[in-house]
Design a protein with these regions (language model features):
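Membrane-interface alpha helices of multi-pass inner-membrane proteins
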Residues: 4-18, 29, 51-56
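Aromatic-anchored segments of alpha-helical transmembrane domains
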Residues: 12-16, 55-60, 226-235
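Hydrophobic/aromatic-rich transmembrane helices and adjacent perimembrane loops
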Residues: 13-28, 195-198, 223, 233, ...
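Perimembrane helix-loop-helix junctions
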Residues: 24-57
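Transmembrane alpha-helices and membrane-interface helical segments
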Residues: 24-36, 203-211, 227-231, 248-265
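Membrane-proximal stem/loop segments at transmembrane-domain junctions that anchor or position
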Residues: 67-172
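Membrane-interface anchor segments at the N-terminal boundary of transmembrane helices
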Residues: 144-223, 227
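Membrane-interfacial, low-structure loops and terminal tails that flank and connect transmembrane helices
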Residues: 267-297
Length: 297
């Protein structure tokens, strides 16, 4: 209980900063629920109620604060169903990516939530029927959407700056900055990002497999549930590789454990130096073999 207040406040802060962090709030509640049922700690239901109340309440308090100071009713804003509709439609960048659809629908409805939601529900039904009738299109749509988000190694870190106005001014006039976006430095960065991402994914899979074999703790279940929730959410709702960067950072924790399992198996301390070296060389060969195939493709 000593950690309940600071944990709830930090969770509330994350929800206020980015509403999508409600995914992590749900993951925390699921992990707490599993812990309560497993250990029969029924009083811990208070913890779930408290963290939800603080997180949701803080978000609403921020809105109320702005309304009171401005004297303007901010309304509900764009409902999540509009972002679901956008996530199921085509985009100029990739399937289901940001396409300005949610905002356009809301504005065309004159900020009327009911009208905009009705339009979105109708369009969602049409899209679901199309996915049902054309399995090839459905598989192609979602495979491209998933890969374009999770397999984009820079997570738009360079692109998002490149499309801004300053790129056409001071950046083009600076040789080093221009190289970061278009030249040799750009190629080096993307190769590095690509390699780092690939290693992280491989080690993440090893780390998760090791934790499942070891029996996951409540904390591990919470984090894995959050990652799964983020994956499902951005597969269905409006997508961007930018959005999944936070989940990739969380995956690094599991990757570090995966690396630990690789370089230090049970009998590691009993192995000779030559055996240890062989283990390291085997790992290097696997990684560089995968990397070379990736580059060729």
């Amino acid at each position: 209980y000593l950690n309940l207040l600071p944990a709830s406040l930090l969770m509330a802060l994350s929800v206020v900063a980015k509403y999508n962090n409600m995914i992590w709030l749900a993951a925390i509640c699921i992990a707490l629920l599993i812990y309560i049922i497993k250990n029969k700690k029924w009083l811990h239901f208070v913890s779930i109620a408290f963290v939800v109340l603080i997180s949701v309440g803080s978000f609403n308090l921020v809105i109320m604060s702005y309304e009171k100071r401005s004297g303007v009713d901010l309304g509900k804003g764009v409902d999540q169903i509009l972002y679901l509709d956008a996530g199921l439609n085509e985009s100029a960048m990739a399937p289901g990516w940001y396409n300005d659809m949610a905002k356009s629908q809301f504005l065309n409805a004159n900020l009327d939530n009911k009208k905009a939601d009705t339009w979105a529900k109708t369009d969602i039904k049409e899209r679901l029927n199309k996915f049902k009738q054309d399995s090839h299109y459905r598989n192609n749509f979602f495979s491209k959407k998933i890969l374009s988000q999770w397999n984009e190694p820079s997570y738009e870190s360079l692109w998002v700056s490149q499309v801004k106005g300053h790129y056409f001014g001071e950046v083009k006039e600076n040789t080093t900055l221009y190289s970061i976006y278009n030249g040799k430095i750009n190629k080096f960065l993307y190769d590095y990002f690509d390699f780092f991402q690939m290693i992280t994914f491989i080690l993440f899979a090893i780390g998760v497999a090791g934790l499942i074999k070891k029996r996951c703790s409540a904390e591990t279940i919470m984090i894995l549930t959050g990652l799964a929730g983020g994956f499902i959410y951005h597969t269905l709702f409006e997508g961007k590789s930018q959005y999944v960067l936070t989940y990739f950072i969380v995956m690094i924790m599991f990757s570090s454990y995966g690396l630990y399992l690789l370089v230090k198996p049970k009998n590691f301390n009993n192995n000779s130096d030559s055996e240890k070296e062989t283990l390291g060389n085997k790992f290097k060969k696997v990684i560089f073999k995968i990397d070379s195939k990736t580059r060729q493709s």
